[in-house]
Amino acid sequence: MENAMETKHSNRARSRKGALRGAVLAGALMALVGCQTSPAATTSSNTGGTNMQLQLTQEWDKTFPLSAKVEHRKVTFANRYGITLAADLYLPKNRGGDRLPAIVIGGPFGAVKEQSSGLYAQTMAERGFVTLAFDPSYTGESGGQPRNVASPDINTEDFSAAVDFISLLPEVNRERIGVIGICGWGGMALNAVAVDKRVKAVVTSTMYDMTRVMSKGYNDSVTLEQRTRTLEQLGQQRWKDAESGTPAYQPPYNELKGGEAQFLVDYHDYYMTPRGYHPRAVNSGNAWTMTTPLSFMNMPILTYIKEISPRPILLIHGERAHSRYFSETAYAAAAEPKELLIVPGASHVDLYDRLDRIPFDRIAGFFDEHL
């Protein structure tokens, strides 16, 4: 399959106009979704003065079967803001006594570690890497209040906190750390790696730049008037939340009413069917807070993408993905060494879990070469 991939290197980037126009800013988020080892079931998390107990499941509740080739552990670790994150650690069973390269994995935006990131983590562990799939702050089994809120700053920090944790494991060579970001966490991964020089290589799969789509809409179609109106509405919502003492939430995601764009149908097919449904996922019929877009509106996370160089970037996207332009723009903005790999015929969601579409051989080869 990988010989059929369309790979783009410097001076060969191809621009592509998106088919989606006129997305209003307030709807951009809704359109998108459509560690210390702890054997105990709970662990304390001090999150902004709120002492939470993380309720960690002990049964296998992933959307994919457990591989006989890996060892799995539930773990927790704290980020720099004192939020305790829950994660799944995967180790190759035939690892021997050598310290191994490691990969930290996050995403998609609104998903949990039991979904796509866990599948990537387990598959890469089968190929000889120690891997960690984590729930971002405020979501899944991780700590933080209020629930289901996102932040480009805190969620970027989540990646570096995961690097902190995995680097201290006795099975890991801390000089050989990589990162994979999926969907909206692809942009977060690039932002984290730009500032975190401990990471030696980064891969994004079916990437979104969440700050771009929330501030400008799909294909940058939002006007200044629309943006201003949205910010005014979000400001009014802040007053309502302050008056009630609790945040309001958007309508449940990925419930189809008919007439939706194909990519929204694709989201539903993953998040709301047995294929990928998970009750803790924001995208599986839950929702983000109404004011979640605020922190994304004026904080462009790819500003310093050039500073990832001289460490290599591999950007992977589906040929038919509505989001393809995010990877193409990131590729154009990044410095060498960089590679854009287009998967023929693949949609955005295909790269969440379709083993016949995700180029795991290429991903493993990339990290084998650069870690």
UniProtKB/Swiss-Prot annotation:
It comes from the Bacteria. GO terms for molecular function: hydrolase activity. Gene3D superfamilies: 1.10.10.800, alpha/beta hydrolase (3.40.50.1820). To E.coli YcjY. This is Uncharacterized protein PA2218.
